[in-house]
Amino acid sequence: MKRITIGLVAAATGLFMLAGCTGTTGGGTTPTGTDSSAAATNAGGTIKIGLNYELSGNVASYGEESVKGVELAADEINAAGGINGKQIELIKLDNKSDEAESTTVATKLITQDKVVAVIGPATSGRFKASIPVANANKVPVISGSATAEDVTVDAQGNVQPYVFRTCFADSVQGTAMANFVVNELKGKTALIIKDTSSDYAVGLAQSFSDTLKAAGGSIVGEEGYVQGDTDFNSILTKAKAMTYDVIYLPGYYNEVGLIIKAARELGITAPILGADGYDSPTLLALGGASALNDVYFTNHYSSLDQDPTVVKFIAAFKAKYNAEPNAFNAMGYDSLRFVADALTRSDGQTGPALADALASTKDFPGVTGKFTIDAKHNAIKDIMIIGLKDGVQSTSVRIPASS
């Protein structure tokens, strides 16, 4: 596990004035107990925040891209004076895209490095693996992209007191895409091809199916694959022989890129739809530009958005990385700003006080949209539907949170 710290960062493009992004305080429930890490972290003159991300392994792109956003936010916050006069120090560790390693990383960050909060992992399974450590030590963990339905609640439906996410749940994505099929694409029938080894893909497929059926549509069939598969000929041969308006293909970029490429090579021309797992630079490399047409996916952010907050973020990101930001960059950026905002409102208090401030966040002006944290510690915000042309974002439709 490689440790990298960032502190006393030099001035960056687009200074982020912390007071200007502070969410208003609501009536969140304060977790009980005492914080064991606050004294240690505050005594050192910096505020330690841990990063538990997938920096190697099968979904490394998500972690790497999220970290870029976090680091940009840290640059801006530190250049603007830090949080209550203290600089942010990021301690970054690699969970290797592995659930057991995620638990190990969370344990080290919380019990040895004494961080006040942990951002990441990016994916739901790895994020859930870090939760027991967080709750036991009363240190908040935050993910910008863990979208599984059961991330912020336990098996009995009780809210996890130290667990938060700045993204919406999978059911929101599946529902939005099914409505998009009916209302925008004017489709009624769909074939589902899903990663049966992934709770993420299974959950998305279920919410899409339920919503499409409720709208009078139908699912003509379901096919499955598992993470790591590379030969999809059997599935796609069946798909080519069937009749449907769209293919719903929820999954991660590794397999999705290969499936879309193979489908187009077989002559399957139907629109292919998915979710935020598509948003990786690797999708284009795997699928190829010519295959990535008539492809749509739900997402948290679009670089086509002309909102001033988004435009400013894009300019700052390009100045630092010389690249167009994607949703994982934006979600990492928002996640650190969300924590910084709560630390400001908690007057630097950590543990239960920080968790309460996070839970009380209202109308936070995120790059991924203005959001409020609900009673289950989910972010309520708009959703974007992105259309690709030659693998590049060409259209975006904003669906209001109330829809």
Language-model segments: residues:
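Extracytoplasmic "Venus flytrap"
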Residues: 40-69, 93-100, 122-123, 193-202, ...
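An alpha-beta-alpha
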Residues: 55, 158-223, 246, 339
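Hydrophobic alpha-helical segments within soluble ligand-binding/sensing domains
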Residues: 102, 165-190, 202-204, 232-233, ...
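Extracellular/periplasmic bilobed ligand-binding domains
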Residues: 205-298
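Extracellular/periplasmic periplasmic-binding protein-like sensory domains
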Residues: 260-333, 387-401
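Segments of small-molecule ligand-sensing domains
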Residues: 320-329, 340-393
